[in-house]
C-alpha cells in the first residue's frame, strides 16, 4: 500500500516538475513583446547580470511573470475573482455598472486653488478660462456601494470647490443631465458626446457661436478598447466606438518638435494601435499649432490629452490655436506663453487628476528664482 502511495506521489511530483519545465521553456521560446489586452510592453529576457547588485532574480521573476503561458487568461480570472468576491477596489481600475472607471482622484482643494492662481498669474492681463471635466466615477456614484460612493463624494466635494471659482466653465450639470454617456466605457477620456457638451459650454462662456455638425466629417472606429479597461485586467467584454470629427473646412496642423505639417487633425492609422485615442492630433506633442484661414482670433491652450478631441471643434472658431502639453514641452508655462506670441485668450484644459497630481504641471508653474 505504501509502495503504491509512493509511486503516486512520485508521479505527481514529476508531473508538476514537468509542467514547470515546459512552462519555463514556453516562456523563453514563445515570448512576446507586447500585450494587446493589457496594452503594455512586456519584460524582456535578462541578458546580463552582476554578482555585485544581484538583479538577476528580480529580472527573471518579472520576465517569467510577464511571459508565463496563458498569462492573459490567468490575469482575467484573477480580476474576475476580485470582482465576484467584493474586492473590486483591489484592481487598478474599478468596474462600475457597464463601465470601468478610474479610482477617485486624490486631490487637495488648497493645492488646486494655489495651482490655478499661479496659472492666472502666468496669463497676466490675457483673458483666461478653465475647463476641468468631472470624472466618470463622479457621474456614476449612484451605481456604487455606499463605501465606494463615499470616496467619490469626497472627490466631488473637491471638484465643486474648485470649479465654483472664477473663470471655471461649469460642466457637471450638463454632463449629469445627458441621456447618453459622456465618457467611454473602457477609457477615462470623454467621448464625442462629452466633447460636444464641453465645446458648447466653452463657446457659451467665451462668446463664439458653436459650429454646426455640418462643419465636420464624422468617422467612427469600432471596436475601441481604452486603457482603463486594460488596466483592470478584465477580459474585453465591453467595447466602445471611437468617434472622430474632422473639420470639413481647410486647416493646417504643425508639430513643433518634428516640423511636420498636415492638412488634417485626425489620423485613422492610429485607431488600430494600442492607444486608439491617438487618432486625435497624432497623439502627444509638446507644442502644436492648428490654423484655420477662414477664422480669426488666437487661442493658447495649456492642456493634457483631454484637449486632443476638443481642438478639432475649437478650430472652427479660431484662426490659430497653439496647444501646449508641458509633459512633453521643454520649457515652462511662461516660456510657452512667450513662444505663442500674443494670444487673445488662454484656455487651461486639464483633467482633475492632471491638475492635482501631474508633477510636470506643478514643476513648470514654479516661478524662476
Describe the predicted segments one by one.
Residues 1-369:
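Extracellular glycan-modifying ectodomains
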Amino acid at each position: 500500500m505504501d509502495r503504491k502511495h509512493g509511486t503516486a506521489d512520485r508521479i505527481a511530483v514529476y508531473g508538476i516538475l514537468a509542467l514547470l519545465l515546459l512552462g519555463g521553456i514556453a516562456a523563453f521560446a514563445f515570448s512576446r513583446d507586447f500585450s494587446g489586452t493589457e496594452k503594455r510592453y512586456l519584460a524582456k529576457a535578462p541578458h546580463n547580470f552582476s554578482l555585485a547588485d544581484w538583479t538577476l532574480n528580480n529580472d527573471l521573476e518579472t520576465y517569467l511573470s510577464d511571459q508565463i503561458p496563458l498569462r492573459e487568461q490567468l490575469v482575467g480570472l484573477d480580476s474576475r475573482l476580485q470582482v465576484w468576491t467584493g474586492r473590486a477596489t483591489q484592481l487598478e481600475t474599478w468596474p462600475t455598472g457597464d463601465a470601468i472607471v478610474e479610482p477617485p482622484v486624490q486631490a487637495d482643494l488648497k493645492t488646486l486653488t494655489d495651482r490655478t492662481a499661479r496659472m492666472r498669474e502666468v496669463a497676466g492681463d490675457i483673458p483666461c478660462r478653465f475647463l476641468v471635466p468631472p470624472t466618470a466615477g463622479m457621474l456614476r456614484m449612484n451605481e456604487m456601494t455606499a463605501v465606494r460612493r463615499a470616496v467619490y463624494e469626497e472627490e466631488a466635494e473637491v471638484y465643486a470647490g474648485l470649479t465654483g471659482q472664477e473663470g471655471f466653465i461649469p460642466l457637471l450639470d450638463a454632463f449629469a443631465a445627458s441621456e447618453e454617456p459622456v465618457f467611454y466605457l473602457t477609457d477615462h477620456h470623454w467621448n464625442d458626446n462629452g466633447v460636444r457638451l464641453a465645446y458648447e459650454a466653452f463657446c457659451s462662456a467665451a462668446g463664439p457661436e458653436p459650429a454646426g455638425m455640418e462643419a465636420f466629417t464624422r468617422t467612427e472606429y469600432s471596436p475601441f478598447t481604452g486603457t482603463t479597461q486594460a488596466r483592470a485586467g478584465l477580459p474585453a467584454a465591453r467595447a466602445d466606438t471611437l468617434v472622430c470629427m474632422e473639420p470639413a473646412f481647410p486647416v493646417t496642423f504643425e508639430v513643433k518638435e518634428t516640423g511636420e505639417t498636415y492638412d488634417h487633425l485626425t489620423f485613422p492609422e492610429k485607431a488600430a494601435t494600442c492607444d486608439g485615442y491617438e487618432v486625435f492630433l497624432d497623439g502627444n506633442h509638446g507644442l502644436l499649432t492648428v490654423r484655420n484661414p477662414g477664422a480669426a482670433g488666437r487661442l493658447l491652450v495649456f492642456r493634457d490629452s483631454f484637449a486632443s478631441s476638443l481642438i478639432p471643434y475649437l478650430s472652427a472658431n479660431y484662426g490659430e490655436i497653439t496647444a501646449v502639453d508641458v509633459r512633453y514641452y521643454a520649457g515652462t508655462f511662461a516660456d510657452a506663453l512667450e513662444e505663442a506670441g500674443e494670444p487673445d485668450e488662454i484656455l487651461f484644459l486639464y483633467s482633475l487628476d492632471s491638475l492635482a497630481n501631474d508633477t510636470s504641471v506643478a514643476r513648470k508653474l514654479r516661478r524662476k528664482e
